[in-house]
Amino acid sequence: MTLIHMNILMAFSMSLVGLLMYRSHLMSALLCLEGMMLSLFILAALTILNSHFTLANMMPIILLVFAACEAAIGLALLVMVSNTYGTDYVQSLNLLQC
């Protein structure tokens, strides 16, 4: 395993630990999820470049599309919760149930 792969896996692990530790605020959880998605994107792109597997060239782009959709939905939910309750606590999401 090269140093680049270890750095990317370390970034993914740090984002995962951050998500598990700071899960009380929605904004910090969204930032950690975004860090995880970006490290997965870089890892997928490096793996495809190193293996010369041409059929999987679209996988990093599809991963970026899913990350953009996740970020847009998360930010919309953050704006709605902060406008409604005045805080960005994840506990406020339980109050949105019908």
From Swiss-Prot:
Gene3D superfamilies: 1.10.287.3510. The chain crosses the membrane at residues 1-21, 29-49, 61-81. Keywords: Electron transport, Membrane, Mitochondrion, Mitochondrion inner membrane, NAD, Respiratory chain, Translocase, Transmembrane, Transmembrane helix, Transport, Ubiquinone. GO terms for biological process: ATP synthesis coupled electron transport. The keyword Kinase does not apply. It comes from the Eukaryota. Pfam families: Oxidored_q2 (PF00420). GO terms for cellular component: mitochondrial inner membrane; respiratory chain complex I. Its EC number is 7.1.1.2. It is found in: Mitochondrion inner membrane. GO terms for molecular function: NADH dehydrogenase (ubiquinone) activity. It is a multi-pass membrane protein. The keyword Cytoplasm does not apply. It is an enzyme of class 7 (translocase). Core subunit of the mitochondrial membrane respiratory chain NADH dehydrogenase (Complex I) which catalyzes electron transfer from NADH through the respiratory chain, using ubiquinone as an electron acceptor. Part of the enzyme membrane arm which is embedded in the lipid bilayer and involved in proton translocation. Belongs to the complex I subunit 4L family. Core subunit of respiratory chain NADH dehydrogenase (Complex I) which is composed of 45 different subunits. This is NADH-ubiquinone oxidoreductase chain 4L.
